[in-house]
Amino acid sequence: MAKVVLKAPDGPPSDVERIKRESRYLRGTLAETMEDPISAGIPDDDNRLMKFHGSYLQDDRDVRTERQKQKLEPAYQFMIRVRTPGGVATPEQWLVMDEIARKYANGTLKLTTRQAFQLHGVLKWNVKKTMQAINGALMTTLAACGDVNRNVMCNPNPYQSEVHAEVYEWAKLLSDHLLPKTRAYYEIWLDDEKVAGTPQVDGEEEPIYGPTYLPRKFKIGIAVPPSNDVDVFSQDIGLIAIVEDGKLAGFNVAIGGGMGMTHGDKTTYPQLAKVIGFCTPDQVVEVAEKIMTVQRDYGNRSVRKNARFKYTIDRLGLEVVKEEIERRLGWKLGEARPYHFEHNGDRYGWVEGVNGTWHFTLYVEGGRVKDDDDYKLMTGLREIAKVHTGDFRLTANQNLVIANVTSEKKAEIEALIAKYGLTDGKRYTALRRNSLACVALPTCGLAMAEAERYLPKLLDKIEEIIDENGLRDEEITIRMTGCPNGCARHVLAEIAFVGKAVGKYNMYLGAAFNGTRLGKLYRENIGEEEILRELRVLLARYAKERLDGEHFGDFVIRAGIVKEVTDGTNFHD
């Protein structure tokens, strides 16, 4: 297939655009709908708006068929996402989230791939109380979902250096500046009260977004080389911190990343952001705003599957988009500066910071904080939060850093880690430590197959092959998503599985270990037996034929197993 050439949007605006336009800045009839006692669900128009408030209406798909037989409405429930720039939460905030999860949700916390909290299983009657409790802890769900700028990501441990701390401050500034200004959120959930300490939001109009906000979601992430833990090239705006003489000189600016696609539609594809220049720290907020307004004005509002910024850039041309950004800025971006990425994973266990504090990175399988019969992760973290004087940092790989532990507190924290058996993951294979999975079934309405619930079981079987080939400590990234939307940034994993139907997956190989190259479709619509058969051959070859220091993703390309993807527009070649 030739390189994809996208048509200009020439149809009428999609129905979602009507909903936004008529919503009176995200109000709609949400206030009335949420008070309606007749149904546990809400109408579709309001559900579209609900996303901007940080929540999705879902249902328990495990019982959907049975409820249909009984002529009952679906087991409706809400997912609520908490916006935490850079993934930072205080111990007090952690304890509030823990309490909310047990009181109003399904008793678990999900740490997301965008460094946010998710609550699942919240019933309609408890949504407002949940929102109020979250805001009472000086957090918000506003713009955690929807056609707006989402949670701003950055390296999760700002106290590794002064640069990390500074980058985190810029992530917070970007997050606050690009937050919607509507009062609707406060009117509906907080009875129009402003909570002290939360970002200032006031005014009736949206000076940046306008009445219809953006054509689709928008994502920003900041990476600090050599770590690409935020997968900076998957972002609509990827900012690469440039450090010179130990100081933050500024950011290389990359635009147009995105992982989502639609099965069978070759006009949709994942894409990596491309570097267009450099800006200084004091310019970065203005640069991000102007980039976002280009997408606001030129993005496809007719066909939502082609509405992300990556498609706008590929349709108009990178240079055209760059020129328009610079026209709006009134000045030209600087020349991009050298940088180098080594990996996109986390560093586990204890790490000493530059200021005498300690940080413990905890492995959290699937990002799910819960208590099982034999592993009391949720209880252990609750007890740590009660005595911890530093903070918690959610990583982009669904793990958790117990950060800024003082020397005086370290022994106490270590004792609690030991008491509850909390793990840094080092007893697992490196493959498992480098795994990611989205939520998928039973709550996600888009999921075509399992992900979070299934990947650990599949890994049990893959690890047998890993051990047979002496690869237990070999760092290989593996990710699974229940659909092709890419919440777990699937095609940036060296081995990736994308749900096609229940028990069936498309298998991708060949992404770069450092997140700088997309994977390629290797096998389509395969089940567990074929997955294991393929991996048995591939991993055996890798163990025998790899070069010194060669990563698995590089090996499968060099060996001719898959073709290298050089750009998203030829992803389907």
Swiss-Prot record:
Q: Which residues bind siroheme?
A: 487
According to UniProt, this protein's pathway is: Sulfur metabolism; hydrogen sulfide biosynthesis; hydrogen sulfide from sulfite (NADPH route): step 1/1
* GO process terms (BP): cysteine biosynthetic process; hydrogen sulfide biosynthetic process; sulfate assimilation
Q: What is its EC number?
A: 1.8.1.2
Q: Which EC class, in a word?
A: oxidoreductase
Molecular functions (GO terms)? 4 iron, 4 sulfur cluster binding; heme binding; metal ion binding; NADP binding; sulfite reductase (ferredoxin) activity; sulfite reductase (NADPH) activity
Annotated cofactor note = Binds 1 siroheme per subunit. Binds 1 [4Fe-4S] cluster per subunit.
**Any idea which UniProt keywords this protein has?**
4Fe-4S, Amino-acid biosynthesis, Cysteine biosynthesis, Heme, Iron, Iron-sulfur, Metal-binding, NADP, Oxidoreductase
The highest taxon in the source lineage is Bacteria
Repeat listed as a keyword: no
Q: One Pfam family for this entry, by name? A: NIR_SIR
Stated family: Belongs to the nitrite and sulfite reductase 4Fe-4S domain family.
Q: What is the protein's known function?
A: Component of the sulfite reductase complex that catalyzes the 6-electron reduction of sulfite to sulfide. This is one of several activities required for the biosynthesis of L-cysteine from sulfate.
Q: What is this protein called?
A: Sulfite reductase [NADPH] hemoprotein beta-component
The organism is Geobacillus thermodenitrificans (strain NG80-2)
Gene name of this polypeptide: cysI
